[in-house]
Amino acid sequence: MAVRKSNPLTPARRGMSFSDFAEITRATPHKSLLSKLSKTGGRNNHGRITARHIGGGHKRRYRLVDFRRSDKDGVKAKVAHIEYDPNRTARIALLHFLDGAKRYILAPSGLKQGDVVESGSSADIRPGNSLCIRDIPVGTILHAVELRPGQGAKLARSAGSSVRLSAKDGDFAILKLPSGEIRMVSLSCRATIGEVGNGQRLNVSLGKAGRSRWCGVRPSVRGVAMNPVDHPHGGGEGKTSGGRHPVSPWGRPEGKTRRANKPSDRFIIRRKSRKRR
C-alpha cells in the first residue's frame, strides 16, 4: 500500500491523503461470505445512548472472516483475491480451498494473489499460514493470536500490528504485544505467521471532518466547552482548564480503562508501557 496526497484544490483537500488501494484485486465481495450489519447509533434497546460519538456513516455488510482456521488443517488454499473490508483497518484475503470451500482471512503483509496458504502442524513458517504456537519457532512475528485454545484470534488483528514470540516456558508461550505488554498464552493457542498488512494506514490524513462522518464517527466535544449541567469540567467564567483532574462525564477519573478484576490479568508478566503526556 502507498499513500497518495491530493492536490490542494480546496482547504479540505490541502491536507488530505489516502491509500492508492494498489493491493486490492477485486471490488465486489463474495456473496456467500456476507451478512447483514445493522446500525445502532450507539443506542441500546431502550433507545438510550450507551456509546458516544457513534452514528451515521455509509451502509456496510459484514464480511465473515475466519479467525479459527482449525477445521481446515492440512487442506491447502489458494489466495484468489485481496479485498477491501469497510469493517476493519486490515485488508482481507479470499481463499479457495482444494475441497471447494471459500473463506476470508486477514491479509498479512506480503501475501499476494495466487499464493498458497495452509493451516495445521505440517504448515511451513510462511506469512498467512496458521499453526499452534508450540509448532512455531521462538522469535517469529505473529498476528491473529488466540488468548484461549479454540476461542478464535483476539490479539494483533488491526492493520500493521504484530506480536513477537519471545520465549516458551512449560505449557505457555511468552508474547510481546504492540503496546509493550508481555503476557503468557497457552502453547495450544493458534497464531498466524507474519504481520497484518496495510501498515501505511497510520500515514493517511483524513483532511476533513466529513471523512470521519462517512465512517460513522460523530464529533467529540470537550468537557470544558460544555455547561456545568453536562460535564464536571463545564462552566466557569471565560476559558478555564476544568479546575480538577480529568474525569469522564460521569465523574470517573480519566485514563483507567482496564477492569480491576479481569481474570486474564494473572497471565500478564509486564503491563503495557505508559505514554508520556
UniProtKB/Swiss-Prot annotation:
Keywords: Ribonucleoprotein, Ribosomal protein, RNA-binding, rRNA-binding. It comes from the Bacteria. Residues 253-268 have a biased composition (Basic and acidic residues). Pfam families: Ribosomal_L2, Ribosomal_L2_C. InterPro entries: NA-bd_OB-fold, Rib_uL2_dom2, Ribosomal_uL2, Ribosomal_uL2_bac/org-type, Ribosomal_uL2_C, Ribosomal_uL2_CS, Ribosomal_uL2_dom3, Ribosomal_uL2_RNA-bd_dom. SMART domains: Ribosomal_L2 (SM01383), Ribosomal_L2_C (SM01382). Residues 225-277 are annotated as: Disordered. One of its GO terms (molecular function) is transferase activity. PROSITE patterns: RIBOSOMAL_L2. GO terms for cellular component: large ribosomal subunit. The keyword RNA-binding applies. GO terms for biological process: cytoplasmic translation. Transmembrane segments: none annotated. HAMAP family: Ribosomal_uL2_B. One of the primary rRNA binding proteins. Required for association of the 30S and 50S subunits to form the 70S ribosome, for tRNA binding and peptide bond formation. It has been suggested to have peptidyltransferase activity; this is somewhat controversial. Makes several contacts with the 16S rRNA in the 70S ribosome. Belongs to the universal ribosomal protein uL2 family. Part of the 50S ribosomal subunit. Forms a bridge to the 30S subunit in the 70S ribosome. This is Large ribosomal subunit protein uL2.
